[in-house]
């Protein structure tokens, strides 16, 4: 097996990712427990050649101190997006990447 930190690069933090984490745990006002998803979901940036079993093993190895168990892994590749810099003169592309939505067993979290 590869080093877990070569498979999972970093935790992906966006508004949508935080919503997936927060709504599943039912914390905060105005949020109903289980209104969006039953189990906690976290999003990670992973290596392009990583498979779902590799990602699950790496997450469990990285967070072994917290004793998390992975229930399900969904992956998707985000395509590079065109960009323009300085009034459209310099054109380029953002980097594409692969992300994984990891669902933990109910009652487990990394937060």
UniProtKB/Swiss-Prot annotation:
Q: Which GO terms describe its cellular component?
A: ribonucleoprotein complex; ribosome
**Superkingdom per UniProt:** Bacteria
Does the record carry Manganese as a key word? Answer: no
GO biological-process terms attached to the record: translation
Q: What GO molecular-function term can you cite, just one?
A: structural constituent of ribosome
Among InterPro entries, the record links this protein to:
Nucleotide-bd_a/b_plait_sf, Ribosomal_uL23-like, Ribosomal_uL23/eL15/eS24_sf
* Record's keyword terms, sorted: Ribonucleoprotein, Ribosomal protein, RNA-binding, rRNA-binding
> Which chain regions cross the lipid bilayer?
none
This molecule's function is given as: One of the early assembly proteins it binds 23S rRNA. One of the proteins that surrounds the polypeptide exit tunnel on the outside of the ribosome. Forms the main docking site for trigger factor binding to the ribosome.
Oligomer status and interactors: Part of the 50S ribosomal subunit. Contacts protein L29, and trigger factor when it is bound to the ribosome.
Q: Family, per the entry?
A: Belongs to the universal ribosomal protein uL23 family.
Annotated HAMAP family: Ribosomal_uL23_B
What protein name is recorded for this chain?
Answer: Large ribosomal subunit protein uL23
Which gene produces this protein? rplW
């Amino acid at each position: 097996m590869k080093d877990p930190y070569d498979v999972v690069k970093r935790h992906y933090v966006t508004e949508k990712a935080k919503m997936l984490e927060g709504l599943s745990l039912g914390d905060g006002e105005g949020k109903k427990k289980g209104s969006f998803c039953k189990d906690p979901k976290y999003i990670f940036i992973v290596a392009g050649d990583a498979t779902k079993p590799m990602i699950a093993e790496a997450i469990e190895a990285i967070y072994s101190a917290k004793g998390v168990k992975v229930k399900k892994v969904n992956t998707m590749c985000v395509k590079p997006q065109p960009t323009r810099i300085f009034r459209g003169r310099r054109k380029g592309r953002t980097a594409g990447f692969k992300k994984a939505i990891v669902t933990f067993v109910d009652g487990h979290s990394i937060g």
